[in-house]
Amino acid sequence: MRRWEHYEHTADIGVRGYGSTLEEAFEAVALGLFDVMVDVRKVEPRECREVEVEEEDLEALLYSFLEELLVLHDMEGLVFGDVRVRIEKTENGYRLKAKACGEVLDYEKHEPKEEVKAITYHDMRIEKLPDGRWMAQFVPDL
């Protein structure tokens, strides 16, 4: 089961996602990112976008994935309330394919909170927990 939470981090806010798989943890942290900006429970899956990134390690993969979602937000005004991820190991690292569904930001409906300026590597961690779940976290630039 995927879930996310926000955690306090000096002047900013951290985003932490959990899942029973690595993919679910990536999905949860992506939803947590958008929940920093809007109430994702109010986002309907009216439009979907596909994202594909390849990187040498998991941290770079998470960074590039979240960056692609943020670019879609900045360029098309989209906010996402559902994200599905597939990650596969490749010869040179990892490949991620994702389908993100949401809608164009509506200020009345979605009640914007914070503006995320950029994805960062700050406090980024991806690990398998002792209970077998996966956790992924980072601190966005607000």
Curated annotation (Swiss-Prot):
<dbReference type="GO" id="GO:0005509">
    <property type="term" value="F:calcium ion binding"/>
</dbReference>
<keyword id="KW-0106">Calcium</keyword>
<dbReference type="InterPro" id="IPR002804">
    <property type="entry name" value="Archease"/>
</dbReference>
<dbReference type="InterPro" id="IPR022952">
    <property type="entry name" value="Archease_arc"/>
</dbReference>
<keyword id="KW-0819">tRNA processing</keyword>
<dbReference type="GO" id="GO:0006388">
    <property type="term" value="P:tRNA splicing, via endonucleolytic cleavage and ligation"/>
</dbReference>
<comment type="function">
    <text>Activates the tRNA-splicing ligase complex by facilitating the enzymatic turnover of catalytic subunit RtcB. Acts by promoting the guanylylation of RtcB, a key intermediate step in tRNA ligation. Can also alter the NTP specificity of RtcB such that ATP, dGTP or ITP is used efficiently.</text>
</comment>
<protein>
    <recommendedName>
        <fullName>Protein archease</fullName>
    </recommendedName>
</protein>
<keyword id="KW-0479">Metal-binding</keyword>
<dbReference type="Pfam" id="PF01951">
    <property type="entry name" value="Archease"/>
</dbReference>
<feature type="binding site">
    <location>
        <position position="142"/>
    </location>
    <ligand>
        <name>Ca(2+)</name>
    </ligand>
</feature>
<comment type="similarity">
    <text>Belongs to the archease family.</text>
</comment>
<feature type="binding site">
    <location>
        <position position="141"/>
    </location>
    <ligand>
        <name>Ca(2+)</name>
    </ligand>
</feature>
<feature type="binding site">
    <location>
        <position position="12"/>
    </location>
    <ligand>
        <name>Ca(2+)</name>
    </ligand>
</feature>
<dbReference type="InterPro" id="IPR023572">
    <property type="entry name" value="Archease_dom"/>
</dbReference>
<dbReference type="InterPro" id="IPR036820">
    <property type="entry name" value="Archease_dom_sf"/>
</dbReference>
